[in-house]
Amino acid sequence: MFGLFVRFTCKDETAAAAFDELVARTGEQIHANEPGTVVYAVHRVDGRPLERVFYELYRDEVAFEEHESKDYVCAFLSDREQYLAATEVDRLGFVSGKGVSLEH
């Protein structure tokens, strides 16, 4: 398993709303087309209205590379920049957890 923890900070509330719409559209495509994407969870951060946190878990690095190559993901990666003030990315190596099978 391979994962990402990503923290996005939007420029302002208008940008945050537009970013959320972009995320929703992209998420629909990920859900429909990516069996190797095990978890793609997006969260608002309590008390920090301009921040969004993504937790992404992929079957393996090949599934992540497939995800990154999709047209809708490439569009997301490009389009998101107009809404963001900052992006922080941590690459994760899975150790253990509830609800996730290592055989996935």
Regions found by a protein language model. Name each.
Residues 1-52, 59-69, 85-104:
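Short S/T/G/P-rich N-terminal loop/turn motif that feeds into the first structured element of a domain
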